């Protein structure tokens, strides 16, 4: 497995996971004010349809600015300016209110409710993975059920799956309160299903599977060809939210979304030690991906990454307030005329003089890609990093947003709002 060397970065931009966890123990606000904020965020989200990409961009901007404003006024002493986290993390009774998380989404995947309307299912058995006849108590048994389920884990566990974990619709995987690792085998597949939330998991060292039978519902199992070995594979899925996961070192992609997938938010994740990080769009000729809409927000792209953060095709992609501290080839790339709206990110280029460019326009001559709409607005470009604009470029344009005044949070604050990226260490009875 290819493991690129980590690059050195200034100490004020790089933190260890233990340092980041220590920095999280700040002051906290009362439950009542946070609950009020969550209601407000939910009302704002419900007023804007996912079908309008520009309005969703506007909504992300507005939520970030509202969170900042309240903090400046003293309302959010525990707030980070991260509207997702500020919606639920200040509640020390988070374990009793787990499903509140479903009302905290932003961006294109904001309507993903997962298993909010179902029962809580507790995974008690990390082993005994039978891909065709899973036992009650196992993760596979939970995810294939037809009814909505909010799936939690009884204790710390490492789950090594024998084949892909093929999820059914309306499921939440909630790792809070335990250290849950899915690793060493095939990992998560979201295929032709909807309303999935994946939160708080360590997903790493995922392998290929296939050439065997796998169950995907209580009534059906089918023959699977060889899988790619992604950490999270979204194949024709919709209303998907991947939040606060730690992902690394998988066979193909860490998170890939293809074949008409849409309405996706990828947020607050910590991604490390991988080559082809994130593919969004199946192929240059698969035009159904023109409807793809993905929000990539508040993630930390960390040590040992090479490329595809993300690599986009056809659709509309909002890359906002992420921290890019490492890449070897490039950070954001694409082909087949995707619209890429990069706002308020922090890009720290590697020392290699040949890899300073953030972007890579792929598989097209310049006279073609110069018409693709890619812009950088408010990004912080460090150590010689540069972003190659194209199409409408950095100018205010309806090609990107209808409300350019509601900008993303300043890139100088990215370190603060991404400091808790990855799977959190949540203890029952304490603020998460």
UniProtKB/Swiss-Prot annotation:
List the record's Gene Ontology CC terms alphabetically: plastid
Record: active site: 308
Signal peptide, first to last residue: 1-45
**Residues reported in the UniProt entry to bind Ca(2+):** 228, 252, 256
| UniProt-listed GO biological process terms | pectin catabolic process
- Glycosylated residues, per the record, are 65
What are the entry keywords?
Calcium, Glycoprotein, Lyase, Metal-binding, Signal
Which pathway does the protein contribute to?
Glycan metabolism; pectin degradation; 2-dehydro-3-deoxy-D-gluconate from pectin: step 2/5
Q: Which Gene3D superfamilies match?
A: Single-stranded right-handed beta-helix, Pectin lyase-like
Family matches, as InterPro entries = AmbAllergen, Pec_lyase, Pectin_lyas_fold, Pectin_lyase_fold/virulence, PEL
Cofactor binding note from Swiss-Prot or TrEMBL: Binds 1 Ca(2+) ion. Required for its activity.
Q: Which Enzyme Commission number(s) are on file for it?
A: 4.2.2.2
Q: What class of enzyme is it?
A: lyase
Q: Please name every pair of cysteines joined by a disulfide bond in this record.
A: none
Reaction equation(s) it catalyzes:
Eliminative cleavage of (1->4)-alpha-D-galacturonan to give oligosaccharides with 4-deoxy-alpha-D-galact-4-enuronosyl groups at their non-reducing ends
Report the Pfam families cross-referenced here: Pectate_lyase_4 (PF00544)
Per the entry, which co-factors are needed?
Ca(2+)
Q: Which GO terms describe its molecular function?
A: metal ion binding; pectate lyase activity
Q: Which family does it belong to?
A: Belongs to the polysaccharide lyase 1 family.
Protein name according to UniProt: Probable pectate lyase 22
Q: What organism, scientifically named, is this protein from?
A: Arabidopsis thaliana
């Amino acid at each position: 497995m290819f493991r690129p060397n980590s690059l050195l970065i200034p100490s004020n931009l790089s933190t260890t996971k233990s340092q980041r966890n220590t920095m999280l123990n700040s002051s906290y606000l009362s439950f009542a004010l946070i609950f009020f904020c969550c209601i407000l965020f939910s009302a704002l989200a419900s007023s804007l349809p996912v079908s309008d990409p520009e309005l969703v961009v506007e909504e992300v901007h507005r939520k970030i600015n509202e969170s900042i404003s309240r903090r400046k006024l003293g309302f959010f002493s525990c707030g980070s300016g991260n509207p997702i986290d500020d919606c639920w993390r200040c509640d020390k009774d988070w374990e009793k209110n787990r499903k509140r998380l479903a009302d905290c989404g932003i961006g294109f995947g904001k309507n993903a409710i997962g298993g909010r309307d179902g029962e809580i299912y507790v995974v008690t058995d990390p082993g005994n993975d039978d891909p065709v006849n899973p036992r009650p108590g196992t993760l596979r048994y939970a995810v294939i059920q037809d009814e909505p389920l909010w799936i939690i884990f009884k204790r710390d566990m490492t789950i090594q799956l024998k084949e892909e974990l093929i999820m059914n619709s309306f499921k939440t995987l909630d790792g809070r309160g335990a250290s849950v690792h899915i690793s060493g085998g095939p990992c998560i597949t979201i295929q032709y299903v909807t309303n999935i939330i994946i939160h708080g998991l360590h997903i790493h060292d995922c392998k290929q599977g296939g050439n065997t039978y796998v169950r995907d519902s209580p009534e059906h199992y089918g023959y699977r060809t060889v899988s790619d070995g992604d950490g999270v594979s979204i194949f024709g899925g919709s209303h998907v939210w991947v939040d606060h996961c730690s992902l690394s070192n998988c066979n193909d992609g860490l998170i890939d979304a293809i074949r008409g997938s849409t309405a996706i938010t990828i947020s607050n994740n910590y991604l490390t030690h991988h080559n082809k990080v994130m593919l969004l769009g199946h192929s240059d000729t698969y035009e159904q991906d023109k409807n793809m809409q993905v929000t990539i927000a508040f993630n930390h792209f960390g040590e040992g990454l090479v490329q595809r953060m993300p690599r986009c095709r056809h659709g509309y992609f909002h890359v906002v307030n992420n921290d890019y501290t490492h890449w070897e080839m490039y950070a954001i790339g694409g082909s087949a005329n995707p619209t890429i709206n990069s706002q308020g990110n922090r890009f720290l280029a590697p020392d290699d003089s040949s890899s300073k460019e953030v972007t890579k326009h792929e598989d097209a001559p310049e006279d073609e890609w110069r018409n693709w709409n890619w812009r950088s607005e408010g990004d912080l470009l460090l150590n010689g990093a540069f972003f190659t604009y194209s199409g409408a470029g950095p100018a205010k344009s309806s090609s990107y947003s209808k409300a350019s005044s509601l900008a993303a949070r300043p890139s100088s604050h990215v370190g603060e709002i991404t400091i808790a990226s990855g799977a959190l260490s949540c203890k029952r009875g304490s603020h998460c």
